[in-house]
UniProtKB/Swiss-Prot annotation:
It is found in: Cytoplasm, Cytosol; Nucleus. Keywords: Chromatin regulator, Cytoplasm, Metal-binding, Methyltransferase, Nucleus, S-adenosyl-L-methionine, Transcription, Transcription regulation, Transferase, Zinc, Zinc-finger. This is N-lysine methyltransferase SMYD2-A. One of its GO terms (molecular function) is RNA polymerase II complex binding. Protein-lysine N-methyltransferase that methylates both histones and non-histone proteins, including p53/TP53 and RB1. Specifically trimethylates histone H3 'Lys-4' (H3K4me3) in vivo. The activity requires interaction with HSP90alpha. Shows even higher methyltransferase activity on p53/TP53. Monomethylates 'Lys-370' of p53/TP53, leading to decreased DNA-binding activity and subsequent transcriptional regulation activity of p53/TP53. Monomethylates RB1 at 'Lys-860'.
Length: 435
């Protein structure tokens, strides 16, 4: 395939940012700017049996691979379509049994290596940026990241050496770094993790904390839609990170994961920081600066502690961490403070896992309004929270509230996902069943 570009857009040199993507025509809110099929992708292990490995369709009665009995497909066409990639893992899963445990990154890298062997021309995923052009930032990796890369290389050799010829370690290190810096997480309508993929053309877009496009997924295809008016010659910006947090946290996260300092209008104006860091009103003695600073340090530490604890603590222990941390932070922070909201969101997730629907609903009700204030318009985080709440209400037979919440989710998803997205049809069906 020859280099053909993406209609309505153009690759260019963005001042101070390097290469980027700009509009050469007008896009209105909700317009599809472009779609990009995955160069390579992998369904996460936890979704096996519920979704097709090839097209990610969620449905009952999928057929499983007769050999490994672990991969599931819609039909023979999907199974055949996935076989070149699945054969990398099929016999290995049979041989290793429960000891077959490569990380998702390793699985994705193995598929990329296989594709590179057979694919010599540009693919439809590389109309404006090829995989080989992706940034790796090897010179900026610290010891911890280098060690993780070495672990991934060892796992590649361990699990895939029978079916793959590997490039040398230097090339492998670069490829893994490219995937870590440019890979995408495919998520469903509730932002649950479905898999990992590489979309080179989507990776060309630079970051802004006030993005004018949003990326959603239709199966294994990424769709980029305008969430602000975009005029000709304006740069097209995506967001690489969760935008809930204050400027200092966002800058730190972008520096750590993507190796650049963000100077977007949101980071220079810090216009939302005061609301995001809301302090409790009506305290008899307002907290001093140092107290607030110490509480922020505590909040960041507890967020990291909880992230690690998810791997080994029980749900009730996790809920206790959430409740104790909210109690401590609540002495200074308002309930609308993003660190409080973070722990409420985690607590809601634990309640959902434990099937404590009332508990999940109570947290969701506290979260939804501040989310709508803190996030930019047409945020998937806000849409998914309305969806979760709507479905909780319906499950608890609060029909009116349920339908109202689902309608609010749909208003965002019509723009972010496009009116013809299968998720929208599913939600409309859920609403029709209530009439």
């Amino acid at each position: 395939m020859k280099k053909e570009g993406i209609e309505g857009t153009e690759r260019f040199l963005s001042p101070g940012k390097g290469r980027g993507l700009k509009a050469i025509k007008h896009f209105k809110v909700g317009d599809l700017v472009f779609a990009c099929p995955a160069y390579a992708y992998v369904l996460t292990v936890n979704e096996r049996g519920g979704r097709c490995e090839c097209c990610f369709t969620r449905k009952e009665g999928l057929s499983k691979c007769g050999k490994c009995k672990q991969a599931y497909y819609c039909n023979v066409e999907c199974q055949r379509g996935d076989w070149p990639m699945h054969k990398l893992e099929c016999s290995a899963m049979c041989a290793y049994g429960e000891n077959w445990c490569p990380s998702e990154t390793v699985r994705l890298v193995a598929r990329i290596i296989l594709k590179q062997k057979h694919q010599t021309e540009r693919t439809p995923s590389e109309r404006v940026l090829t995989l080989r052009e992706l940034e790796a930032h090897l010179d900026k990796l610290d010891n911890e990241k280098n060690e993780m890369n070495d672990t991934d290389i060892a796992a590649l050799h361990h699990f895939y050496s029978r079916h793959l010829d590997f490039p040398d370690n230097a090339a492998l290190t670069e490829l893994i770094a490219q995937v870590n810096c440019n890979g995408f997480t495919i998520e469903d309508e509730e932002l649950s993790h479905l898999g990992s993929a590489l979309f080179p053309d989507v990776a060309l877009m630079n970051h802004s904390c006030s993005p004018n496009v949003i990326v959603t997924y239709k199966g294994t295809v990424a769709e980029v839609r305008a969430v602000q008016e975009i005029n000709p010659e304006e740069e097209i910006f995506n967001s690489y990170i969760d935008l809930l947090y204050p400027t200092e946290d966002r800058i730190e996260r972008l520096k750590d994961s993507y190796f650049f300092n963000c100077d977007c209008k949101e980071c220079t104006s810090k216009s939302k920081d005061e609301a995001k860091m809301e302090i409790r009103q009506k305290l008899s003695i307002p907290p001093e600066e140092e107290e607030i600073k110490q509480m922020v340090i505590y909040a960041r530490n507890v967020i990291e502690e909880f992230r690690r604890a998810k791997h080994y603590k029980t749900p009730s222990e996790l809920l206790e961490i959430c409740e104790l941390s909210m109690e401590k932070m609540g002495a200074i922070f308002a309930e609308t403070n993003v660190y409080m909201l973070h722990m409420m969101y985690q607590a809601m997730g634990v309640c959902l896992y434990m099937q404590d629907w009332d508990g999940a609903m109570k947290y969701g009700e506290k979260i939804i309004h501040p989310y709508s204030v803190h996030y930019p318009p047409y945020s998937l985080n806000v849409a998914s929270m309305y969806l979760k709440l709507g479905r909780l209400y319906l499950g608890l037979e609060k029909r009116t509230q349920g339908v109202k919440a689902l309608k609010k989710a749909l208003a965002i998803m019509d723009i972010a996902h496009g009116k013809d997205h299968p998720y929208i049809d599913e939600i409309k069906k859920e609403m029709e069943e209530q009439t």
